[in-house]
């Protein structure tokens, strides 16, 4: 722990005044309370009448009770002054509190980072296993070279399109064959007509 630096003269004087106020107020409370206890004790007969003595004791108790209240208020004011002094002048304690808070936050950040890294690794492993299971279950759709699933579906679509293209000409072949037969029909219809003339 670093050695505490010496306070400036003004601060040292202020602390001494606070210490003196504390001692004076405590002494005032103790003295007045002791005198109130003494006044409450019944004394022997004196030259002063009991009524007069009673009024005097009552007045003295009120005064000493007021002194106790004043000393208590002074102590409360002293506590407030000490808090203000510590807030405004106790920079080492403030810096230490800030450092402790920073260390706590750093430790929390490191813990969160470790948990996130662990979660990332677990998710990566699970995702890899799911991908392997998915591609192995769809291996029947792939070729021998183990194409990706999207390319396998793409090739299946191409095969289906080519099959449709081959079946269409087969169905249309009778219609195409009717053309030459219809074109040959006029030849037979003119069979009774004169034949072509020969040129010499």
From Swiss-Prot:
Residues 190-200 have a biased composition (Gly residues). Disulfide bonds: none annotated. Component of the Mediator complex, a coactivator involved in the regulated transcription of nearly all RNA polymerase II-dependent genes. Mediator functions as a bridge to convey information from gene-specific regulatory proteins to the basal RNA polymerase II transcription machinery. Mediator is recruited to promoters by direct interactions with regulatory proteins and serves as a scaffold for the assembly of a functional preinitiation complex with RNA polymerase II and the general transcription factors. The gene is Med22. Component of the Mediator complex, which is composed of MED1, MED4, MED6, MED7, MED8, MED9, MED10, MED11, MED12, MED13, MED13L, MED14, MED15, MED16, MED17, MED18, MED19, MED20, MED21, MED22, MED23, MED24, MED25, MED26, MED27, MED29, MED30, MED31, CCNC, CDK8 and CDC2L6/CDK11. The MED12, MED13, CCNC and CDK8 subunits form a distinct module termed the CDK8 module. Mediator containing the CDK8 module is less active than Mediator lacking this module in supporting transcriptional activation. GO terms for biological process: positive regulation of transcription elongation by RNA polymerase II; positive regulation of transcription initiation by RNA polymerase II; RNA polymerase II preinitiation complex assembly. GO terms for cellular component: core mediator complex; mediator complex; nucleoplasm; nucleus. Belongs to the Mediator complex subunit 22 family. Keywords: Activator, Coiled coil, Nucleus, Transcription, Transcription regulation. Residues 169-200 are annotated as: Disordered. It comes from Mus musculus (Mouse). Residues 93-122 form a coiled coil. It comes from the Eukaryota. This is Mediator of RNA polymerase II transcription subunit 22.
């Amino acid at each position: 722990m670093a050695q505490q630096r010496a306070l400036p003269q003004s601060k040292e004087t202020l602390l001494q005044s606070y210490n003196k106020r504390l001692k004076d107020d405590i002494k005032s409370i103790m003295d007045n309370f002791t005198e109130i206890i003494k006044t409450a004790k019944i004394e022997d007969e004196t030259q002063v009448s009991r009524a007069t003595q009673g009024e005097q004791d009552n007045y003295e108790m009120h005064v000493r009770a007021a002194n106790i209240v004043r000393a208590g208020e002074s102590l409360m004011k002293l506590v407030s002054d000490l808090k203000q002094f510590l807030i405004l002048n106790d920079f080492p304690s403030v810096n230490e509190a800030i450092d402790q808070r920073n260390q706590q936050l750093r430790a929390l950040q490191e813990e969160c980072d470790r948990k996130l890294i662990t979660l990332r690794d677990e998710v990566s492993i699970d995702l890899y296993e799911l991908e392997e299971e998915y591609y192995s279950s769809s291996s029947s759709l792939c070729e021998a070279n183990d194409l990706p699933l999207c390319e396998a579906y793409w090739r299946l679509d191409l095969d289906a399109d080519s099959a449709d293209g081959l079946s269409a000409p087969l169905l249309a072949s009778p219609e195409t064959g009717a053309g030459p037969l219809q074109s040959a029909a006029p030849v037979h219809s003119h069979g009774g007509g004169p034949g072509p003339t020969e040129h010499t």
